[in-house]
Structure formats: C-alpha cells, structure tokens
C-alpha cells in the first residue's frame, strides 16, 4: 500500500510517500509544495494543484494528514486550517481515503513520546526509512504522518474514526 502523508502549511506544505509491504516500509518520495506570494485564494490554489500533481505522479492508495493545532494567534490557525482544507480537497477529489492524526499521535508513533523535538522526528524518519540524510522538517513531518498511518492503522482506526473522509463524506 502506498501512503501519502501531508504536513499542511500555508507557505510550505510538506508531502511524503512511503510504500508499505507487510511490516516493511520503503521511502518513495518527499518534498514541499511552496505557495509563494499572492492572494490567499491564489496560494490555496497552488497548494491544491501541487498536491494534485503529487497524487497524479505517485498514485498513493490512501492519505494521512496532520490535524491543525490551535495556535496563540487565531488568524494563523484559520489560515493553516484553510491550507489543510485545500490538501484534503485534493486527496478527496482523487478518491483517496483521508485519515487524520494529531502531532502528539505522530510523535508518539515515530519517536516514542509526544513531546519530541522536530530534529528527533527528522532523525527517526531517517532511521525508519533508511535514508542517507534526514529530510527537511516539513517533509519529515509528512513522512512521519505516513509512517504513523502505516504503523498505526489500528491506532488510526480508533483515534480518527470520526474524521475519516471518503468521497467527500465522513465515514
């Protein structure tokens, strides 16, 4: 099964793809979609198009997205939520099932505790996928989200049951 992990952001949205065969995980690709400058609708359109392009290129079977945390600045939280929505819409428009995980769940699944630093997540992603160098922070977070889904489909089935989307509908 090929899993697309997404770490949403308005300026940079990280993506990471892994292939799961039984218990074995293999790295496929990772990177970021940059929205650049411009109006909010234009930037969201770039993110939507970029994730669509990733899906068309790598043909994942399912998608895992990090859930937005509530920031001190409500405006930032709203903008991040819109970027996340653009990524989810891209996945759903390509008939992918979407599972959602909190940052705490991702860190626990990949590092072993929920208060892990970004550098710890990067290092564990590097080790788990046998990469020569650690991926960038955004790509590592996306790969960690995909790894969480692969390792924790049982975790995700319970923790995100009310948030799964298929064909644009909650399942």
UniProtKB/Swiss-Prot annotation:
Necessary cofactors: Mg(2+)
PROSITE patterns in the record: RUVC
Keywords: Cytoplasm, DNA damage, DNA recombination, DNA repair, DNA-binding, Endonuclease, Hydrolase, Magnesium, Metal-binding, Nuclease
Cofactor binding mode and count: Binds 2 Mg(2+) ion per subunit.
Pfam families, alphabetized: RuvC (PF02075)
Major site of localization recorded for this protein: cytoplasm
Binding of Mg(2+) 1, residues: 7, 138
Reaction catalysed by this enzyme: Endonucleolytic cleavage at a junction such as a reciprocal single-stranded crossover between two homologous DNA duplexes (Holliday junction)
GO terms, biological process: DNA recombination; DNA repair
The enzyme's E.C. designation: 3.1.21.10
Similarity comment: family membership: Belongs to the RuvC family.
Function: The RuvA-RuvB-RuvC complex processes Holliday junction (HJ) DNA during genetic recombination and DNA repair. Endonuclease that resolves HJ intermediates. Cleaves cruciform DNA by making single-stranded nicks across the HJ at symmetrical positions within the homologous arms, yielding a 5'-phosphate and a 3'-hydroxyl group; requires a central core of homology in the junction. The consensus cleavage sequence is 5'-(A/T)TT(C/G)-3'. Cleavage occurs on the 3'-side of the TT dinucleotide at the point of strand exchange.
Name by which UniProt lists this protein: Crossover junction endodeoxyribonuclease RuvC
Origin species: Thiobacillus denitrificans (strain ATCC 25259 / T1)
Phylogenetic classification of the source organism: Bacteria, Pseudomonadati, Pseudomonadota, Betaproteobacteria, Nitrosomonadales
């Amino acid at each position: 099964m090929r899993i697309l992990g997404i770490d949403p952001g308005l300026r940079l949205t990280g993506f990471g793809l892994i292939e799961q065969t039984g218990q074995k995980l293999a790295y496929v690709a990772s990177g970021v979609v940059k929205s650049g400058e411009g109006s909010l609708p234009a930037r969201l359109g770039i993110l939507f198009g970029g994730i669509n392009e990733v899906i068309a290129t790598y043909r994942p079977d399912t998608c895992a997205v990090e859930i937005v945390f509530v920031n001190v600045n409500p405006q930032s939280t709203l903008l991040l939520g819109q970027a996340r929505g653009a990524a989810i819409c891209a996945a759903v428009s390509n008939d992918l099932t979407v599972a959602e995980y909190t940052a705490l769940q991702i860190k626990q699944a990949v590092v072993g505790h929920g208060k892990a630093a970004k550098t710890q997540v990067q290092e564990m992603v590097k080790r788990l996928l046998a990469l020569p160098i650690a991926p960038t922070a955004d790509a590592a977070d996306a790969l960690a989200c995909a790894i969480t889904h692969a390792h924790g489909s049982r975790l995700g089935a319970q923790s995100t049951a009310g948030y799964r989307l298929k064909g644009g509908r909650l399942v």
